[in-house]
């Protein structure tokens, strides 16, 4: 793990308010000399190299999307996200890559990410995009951008930022290091990590128990069962 400072970071950032913030520097293999940084009238911008076939995941709780590759995302707080734009109850400016690294941006600003952008001046073209899809596999295959592409991060109003580059053999290892960096945390019960299911708010106790029985008999890994709350009808 390595901390890199670009420009003049802001004073009020998440790490300042994290009593258990644990940064331990270790050598990394990431090509930091290929990171590009600049400030503009709008804020600051960083660009990171991206390898062919590299896949990106993360940005905290994301309800509408899992794989962020070739997507534009904004880590914006929103209690009712309706599309896969990065809006979330709990967005985090941290992503992980299948190339063996993750990057945390120590900023409280909304960060605008572009995961797979052609270098400036290069056309946005996909490998084999002239080929006609004639099967399900080719139609839904992960497309790769032709030429050199980057990961871009724009931070409006900021004149700089600290980033933490974390490396590991697996995504789990990278996320574990991020968890320790951000202060660790208590272990949650196993059922708390399972899917939840909400029954109709008018269900009786017998109907709820029957639903629970059905889920178990069909090996559905639901660990939390509840009722639809009615959504503020009598708040």
For each feature predicted by the language model, list its residue ranges.
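Catalytic and substrate-binding clefts that recognize carbohydrates or anionic sugar/phosphate headgroups
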Residues: 1-189, 199-201, 205-206, 212-217
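Aromatic- and carboxylate-enriched substrate-binding clefts and catalytic-loop regions
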Residues: 47, 221-235
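Loop/turn elements at helix/coil->beta-strand transitions in domains of secreted/extracellular proteins
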Residues: 188-193, 220-223
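Aromatic-lined carbohydrate-recognition surfaces of secreted/lumenal glycan-active proteins
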Residues: 193-199, 225-229
